[in-house]
């Protein structure tokens, strides 16, 4: 089997029709037609010799065809069974294909392979969950190059006091340097999505902001963002009722020791503020 013309919507549609395949909206399937952008993304990923690369949502191989030329070891994840069979016919000698939901498969695969780099056009319904799950699990890739809906990209890069700043912003920027590569217009995809996308590169930080208890840091950060319009004080009081040993902590004293204004909201705090707050809390528990 030969690869189709990945630059042509008509050629891709014909390729699918001839093999009884079709696109599934529920999986957010959109193929990137722009050959210049495809090449740019692989160049930015820049895997080194001997490194394992993951591709998330390989489709019928537009990015895979480039990755096999630029990586020694490649694993692709694909949920669509028809596409899985196609990938195996096109690239079987060079690629490990894992069938299924990457959210369910990645942890076991990472334990086996220790991947360094990840590339993927991530659908809206899994983008934040996949990136968030890997970070929360302590698995940090050397580099990730992802294409996501622009809304997700804005959340990943947002800074304190900006509209899209959230727990997810803190989570991503805690472990990665996050940079926007470019916005990607709907016309660059087939089928055309109804939203603008964004390509980003996440590079593992050389010096990660350290905290005494990473799990507590994440828990405190998530708690403070759980009700965005509430103050730090009120969110901590809510947390206090649920946390074992929380009753022994004076919220006002905690904020004072951490140098945090108890009247502030989570969206006003920096990563270092959350770390200071969680470290101070750990000392008081």
Swiss-Prot record:
InterPro entries: KsgA/Erm (IPR001737), rRNA_Ade_diMease-like_C (IPR023165), rRNA_Ade_Mease_Trfase_CS (IPR020596), rRNA_Ade_methylase_Trfase_N (IPR020598), rRNA_adenine_dimethylase (IPR011530), SAM-dependent_MTases_sf (IPR029063). It catalyses: adenosine(1518)/adenosine(1519) in 16S rRNA + 4 S-adenosyl-L-methionine = N(6)-dimethyladenosine(1518)/N(6)-dimethyladenosine(1519) in 16S rRNA + 4 S-adenosyl-L-homocysteine + 4 H(+). S-adenosyl-L-methionine binds at residues 30, 32, 57, 78, 101, 121. It comes from the Bacteria. Its EC number is 2.1.1.182. SMART domains: rADc. Keywords: Cytoplasm, Methyltransferase, RNA-binding, rRNA processing, S-adenosyl-L-methionine, Transferase. The keyword Methyltransferase applies. It is an enzyme of class 2 (transferase). One of its GO terms (molecular function) is RNA binding. It is found in: Cytoplasm. Pfam families: RrnaAD. GO terms for cellular component: cytosol. HAMAP family: 16SrRNA_methyltr_A. Specifically dimethylates two adjacent adenosines (A1518 and A1519) in the loop of a conserved hairpin near the 3'-end of 16S rRNA in the 30S particle. May play a critical role in biogenesis of 30S subunits. This is Ribosomal RNA small subunit methyltransferase A. It comes from Treponema pallidum (strain Nichols).
């Amino acid at each position: 089997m030969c690869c189709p013309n990945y630059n042509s919507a008509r050629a891709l549609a014909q390729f699918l029709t001839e093999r009884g395949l079709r696109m599934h909206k529920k999986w957010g399937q959109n193929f990137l037609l722009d050959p210049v952008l495809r090449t740019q993304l692989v160049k930015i990923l820049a895997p080194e010799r001997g490194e394992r690369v993951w591709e998330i949502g390989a489709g019928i191989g537009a990015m895979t065809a480039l990755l096999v030329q630029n990586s020694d070891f490649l694993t692709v994840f694909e949920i669509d069974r028809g596409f899985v069979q196609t990938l195996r016919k096109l690239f079987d000698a060079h690629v490990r294909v894992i069938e299924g939901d990457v959210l369910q498969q990645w942890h076991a695969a990472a334990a086996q392979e220790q991947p360094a780099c990840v590339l993927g056009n991530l659908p809206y319904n899994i983008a934040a969950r996949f990136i968030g799950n890997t970070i929360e699990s302590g698995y940090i890739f050397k580099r990730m190059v992802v294409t996501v809906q622009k809304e997700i990209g804005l959340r990943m890069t947002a800074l304190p006091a900006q509209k899209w700043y959230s727990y997810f912003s803190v989570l991503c920027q805690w472990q990665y340097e996050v940079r926007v590569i470019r916005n990607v217009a709907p016309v660059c995809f087939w089928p055309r999505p109804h939203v603008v996308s964004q390509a980003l590169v996440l590079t593992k930080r050389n010096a990660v902001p350290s905290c005494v208890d990473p799990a507590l840091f994440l828990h405190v950060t998530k708690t403070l963002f759980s009700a965005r319009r509430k103050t730090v004080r009120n969110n901590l009081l809510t947390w206090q009722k649920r946390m074992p040993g929380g009753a022994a902590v004076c919220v006002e004293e905690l904020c004072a020791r951490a140098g945090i204004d108890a009247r502030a909201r989570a969206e006003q705090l920096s990563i270092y503020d959350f770390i200071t707050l969680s470290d101070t809390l750990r000392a008081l528990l």
